[in-house]
Amino acid sequence: MAWKEIDMKKIINKPENYTDDMLHGIYQAHPDMVKYVENDLRCYCTAKKKEGKVAIITGGGTGHLPLFLGYVGENMLDGCGVGSVFQSPSAEQIYNISKEVESGAGILFLYGNYTGDIMNFDMASEMLEMDDIQTRSIVGADDVLSNKNPDARRGVAGIFFMYKCAGAKAAQMGTLDEVLAAAQKAKDNTRTVGFALTPCIIPELGHSNFTLGDNEMAFGMGIHGEPGVWNGPVKTSRELAEESMKEILGDMPVASGEEVCVLINGLGATSQEELYILTGDVEDILKEKGIKVYRTFVGEYATSMEMAGASISICKVADEEMKQWIDMPVHTPFYTQV
């Protein structure tokens, strides 16, 4: 039996001000790290511009913190266009951010594989080319179950590894094409599977955006509530780990002796305890297959507001340079790695 739609209970003011009120709070809390330009809160930029470095700009809708804006900071990203909940930022916002953070080495646009984002980033790129500012673009597309065609897959939590590698290469003062290649290397070696236990509530909608039965979960669901590959009874952590790893390793084979990074991501309302139970099961499966774990990341990296659930991302460590990128210290308002 399906749940009734869940009514909204959130700590907000007006639903229509949700995104701007959130941004106001971030700027108040972290004035030394981030700022906005063109009198537009949604033009989110680093406050510590580094001259001569390739600028990396991302963008996407509100509702996924720390994705997307949460990774703007030292040794990661330089700017983020912020859209309303689950909506794309505008081309004008992306353009204005680009003009602020660009410092002569060009710009890499790195964002999720969603139609509205692609359209607006492409428009911004055309505007920048008219200003003789060089750009390159790459989209995250790590969600294995969203499409059999790799080029049509959604970008979800695995984009973290693209941010990490591209940001590190840019911090090493790599060229625009070298930074793009670093992002591409992470993209080629990253796959994600997610699953939801409860829906989320979009503020302006006022209730849940889909329903699940009392003992039902959705396997393969997207971070905007896109349908998964199946809905069914809630499974154990070990069962979810096994099914997820079957899908990931079936799409991206990893041989015994190879090294991977593991990212266990909470979707917004899943306890740390549950995430670590899942982590243990995933790593046990990898060890049984002779696959070495180079580094593990556990926490909230790409959420869907208050959705309960998790995702598993595996990033195959291709070479020693990739290890250097993954290990590079970073510092943002939402994520620090020492």
Predicted regions and their residues:
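Mixed-charge interfacial surface used for oligomerization/domain docking
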Residues: 172-277
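C-terminal non-catalytic interaction/assembly regions of soluble proteins
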Residues: 247-338
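Short alpha-helices
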Residues: 138-178, 182-189
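Short, acidic/small-residue loops that bind anionic groups at enzyme active sites
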Residues: 80-85, 129-153, 289-293
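Short glycine-rich or small-residue beta-strand-to-loop segments that form or flank ligand, phosphate
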Residues: 9, 54-61, 77-80, 106-115, ...
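Glycine-rich oxoanion-binding loops at beta->alpha junctions
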Residues: 64, 73-103
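N-terminal amphipathic/basic leader segments beginning at the initiator methionine
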Residues: 2-56, 319-338
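Short Gly/Thr/Asp-enriched flexible loops that form oxyanion-binding sites at enzyme active sites
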Residues: 118-132, 274-280
